[in-house]
Amino acid sequence: MRRERQRMMSFEDKDKDDLDNSNSNNSSEMTDTAMMPPLKRLLITGSSDDLAQGSSGKKKMTMATRSPSSSPDLATNDSGTRVQPLPEYNFTKFCYRHNPDIQFSPTHTACYKQDLKRTQEINANIAKLPLQEQSDIHHIISKYSNSNDKIRKLILDGILSTSCFPQLSYISSLVTHMIKIDFISILPQELSLKILSYLDCQSLCNATRVCRKWQKLADDDRVWYHMCEQHIDRKCPNCGWGLPLLHMKRARIQQNSTGSSSNADIQTQTTRPWKVIYRERFKVESNWRKGHCRIQEFKGHMDGVLTLQFNYRLLFTGSYDSTIGIWDLFTGKLIRRLSGHSDGVKTLYFDDRKLITGSLDKTIRVWNYITGECISTYRGHSDSVLSVDSYQKVIVSGSADKTVKVWHVESRTCYTLRGHTEWVNCVKLHPKSFSCFSCSDDTTIRMWDIRTNSCLKVFRGHVGQVQKIIPLTIKDVENLATDNTSDGSSPQDDPTMTDGADESDTPSNEQETVLDENIPYPTHLLSCGLDNTIKLWDVKTGKCIRTQFGHVEGVWDIAADNFRIISGSHDGSIKVWDLQSGKCMHTFNGRRLQRETQHTQTQSLGDKVAPIACVCIGDSECFSGDEFGCVKMYKFDLND
């Protein structure tokens, strides 16, 4: 036994000499001895604690592990075994897999325990071998461990070249697990956050389930701020999702906080984590896509509802019964009814200060809707006022008298734009470009310059009366679906325009006008008509680039935001369309038309449904009004 111990000790000294020679010959190259983990260094030991008794009664050699030591000189452990000094713990002397700072970190404890268990299994298997084979294995491992990178690669090449398929398969199964690197945890935080910012929402949520370190990084506010910036009020080009602004809900929360909470509560409401903001909007968008909503009805008008608009707390409706209803969206109750028009209220517009209504009685009224007082009345149209729009001190109106009027409130002047040959059903201002759009029963759409009161373009393509138009500025034009063959035509000259009789009448210039590129005109125009279609137009060229079919009867009204189009039809249905693709996402059927008899019983008129006369859209809701006087709210924010 003494002879055996001396032989082993001389063998260990020889390994140390080989290591010293290797270090001196490769001083410019970092040795892999320093790359070995202190806890996984394979040592040859002969102590009673590390040697096991075999069935033959002889001592067996084992692979032992030891704890880190900070002593710079050769030391002796409790069993008398000589050990080598350990390098400092840093990334310049350790690779990722053998770095103690990583091994002992909380996020890698489980991985370290698995490796330690694996080492113990190897020790146990070696201990079962004869003493000579144990010595040979330890010599091979020691030689490999003390070699530099170049020698290690040569040894591996030789081993792999002499290995058969069973051994190669075994190596492959081990390496697949061992080469995995948790780069997120070891990189600087800024780089880790940058990498995570490229993930989509689903992948980012999955990342929080990996470990605590990943959860902390994936939940960082900076990552979710980037997600919100990519998706809110725009469509992400990578995943195709866009999230609503929910500005009306935010205004509603601030309004409630101002009335019932302290400044600290308001501050709490306005400083929510970006992940919470994203989650809230993601749920709303998901409900829009799946068609999940809660329906609420507003009943109070005695006749059909012709127009409606809303803000974060109030709903305004105009009806054939010549009244304007103001509803509380929280309670669903009618809080005020404005009377003054002598005929049906066909159109309305409101802002924070005033309410403007147009009626079949040929007048336009301006109201203080808070007090219910009529501030002023505008008379000038010779037939029913069908549409009004306003911006600051300018009001535009369209009428059944075939004209568009521009009212300048401050200068108290009115200009009449002539060109349509039938009723003007809708007018829309675009303040940034000082332009106005109008559509008519003559199947045309006209674009006007309200500074010069001249007609810039005429859009032709509908084969039925055009009922509604919406100017749009679409940024993501590349992903906008268009028809390969458009039946629309370029703007054409119209010889039917005549001068007005009064001095303020302004004849339109029908000569085709090239739009000034320096003026921010809307990029597209959306329209609907009684030809059962919805059309999308390119404002610059004046051509129809897409036609959407789906309704079986005329489309009376449309509304749109950055993601969706809502349409209401005479067939009694409300359809939700994707703005970019033009595909119909959902169809909501209107209520069946019923009338009460004198005995308070309801009599159904067969399968007939109430035609939808008007619609409007918000971030998390849309509204419809039908010809039986019922208003419906489709609420997609189910948490409210």
From Swiss-Prot:
Chain segments carrying region Interaction with SKP1/CBF3D: 180-225
Locate the region Disordered: 1-84, 481-516
Which SUPFAM superfamilies does UniProt cross-reference here?
A: F-box domain, WD40 repeat-like
Hey, which pathway is this one from?
Answer: Protein modification; protein ubiquitination
Q: Give the start-end ranges of region Necessary to mediate nuclear localization.
A: 1-299
Function of the protein: Substrate-recognition component of the SCF(Met30) complex, an E3 ubiquitin ligase complex that mediates the ubiquitination and subsequent proteasomal degradation of target proteins. Negatively regulates sulfur amino acids biosynthesis genes expression. Controls cell cycle function (being required for the G1/S transition and M-phase but not the S-phase), sulfur metabolism, and methionine biosynthesis as part of the SCF(Met30) complex. Required for the efficient binding of CDC45 and MCM proteins to origins of replication. Required for efficient expression of G1 cyclins.
The UniProt-reported impact of residue 530 to D is: Inactivates MET30 and prevents MET4 interaction
The segment annotated Important for mediating homomultimerization runs over 180-277
Q: Which residues carry this modification: Phosphoserine?
A: 67
Give the family, as the similarity comment puts it. Belongs to the WD repeat MET30/SCONB/SCON-2 family.
| Gene name per UniProt | MET30
GO biological process terms, alphabetically, are: cysteine biosynthetic process; G1/S transition of mitotic cell cycle; methionine biosynthetic process; protein polyubiquitination; protein ubiquitination; regulation of mitotic cell cycle; regulation of sulfur amino acid metabolic process; regulation of transcription by RNA polymerase II
Q: Which residues form the F-box domain?
A: 181-227
Q: Which InterPro entries match?
A: F-box-like_dom_sf, F-box_dom, G-protein_beta_WD-40_rep, SCF_subunit_WD-repeat, WD40/YVTN_repeat-like_dom_sf, WD40_repeat_CS, WD40_repeat_dom_sf, WD40_rpt
What is the name of this protein?
F-box protein MET30
Q: Which UniProt keywords apply?
A: Amino-acid biosynthesis, Cell cycle, Cysteine biosynthesis, Cytoplasm, Methionine biosynthesis, Nucleus, Phosphoprotein, Repeat, Transcription, Transcription regulation, Ubl conjugation pathway, WD repeat
From start to end residue, where is composition biased (Basic and acidic residues)? 1-19
Induction of the gene: Transcriptional activation requires MET4 as well as MET31 and MET32. Regulated by intracellular AdoMet levels. L-methionine regulates the abundance of MET30. The amount of MET30 regulates the activity of the E3 ubiquitin ligase complex SCF(Met30).
Annotated region Interaction with MET4: the residues are 277-640
Subunit and partners? Homomultimer. Interacts with CDC53 and SKP1/CBF3D to form the E3 ubiquitin ligase complex SCF(Met30). Interacts with MET4.
Tell me the ranges holding the WD repeats: 300-328, 340-368, 380-408, 419-449, 461-499, 509-538, 550-578, 607-635
Q: List the disulfide bonds.
A: none
- Biased amino acid composition, Polar residues: 45-56, 64-82, 481-495
GO cellular component terms, semicolon-separated = cytoplasm; nuclear SCF ubiquitin ligase complex; nucleus; SCF ubiquitin ligase complex
Subcellular location(s) of the protein = Cytoplasm; Nucleus
